[in-house]
């Protein structure tokens, strides 16, 4: 097994034990749910060595798996070789595949955590529902392992904001439309 990946997974497992969790989901995501993330948020890549833009790492005290779609199966097999991380080929959706995998590796009523900033409320509800069907619990966690175990974590890069020139509407038109919707909904 790759020693750096093994030691990183061990550190995550200590975090889980210290926080009363039985498993952890590491998505490739940032707080904006971007498709491509800044290196500061590439925790899954740091833990597993897998560099594809899609996929989630699933970790328990005794096992780890990467769930990803068919675009990345060959790449994942190559990059995970010797890591001890199993490849789970996505067939039915991330929540369902994750629940199935955790159900096979955990006991009923065990708790799986995920960084609360890296999942949409819609996805969190879906994960919680499919996990409940497998008698597992999902915990949205604010104090996350990447803050404590990721040594030499890259700083966030500051990139300038730019206008999206392909859109038929300019920035002011988009903001006006947004303000109208907010006003209609009674939001501030």
Residues of each region from the PLM?
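Terminal domain-start leader segments
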Residues: 1-188
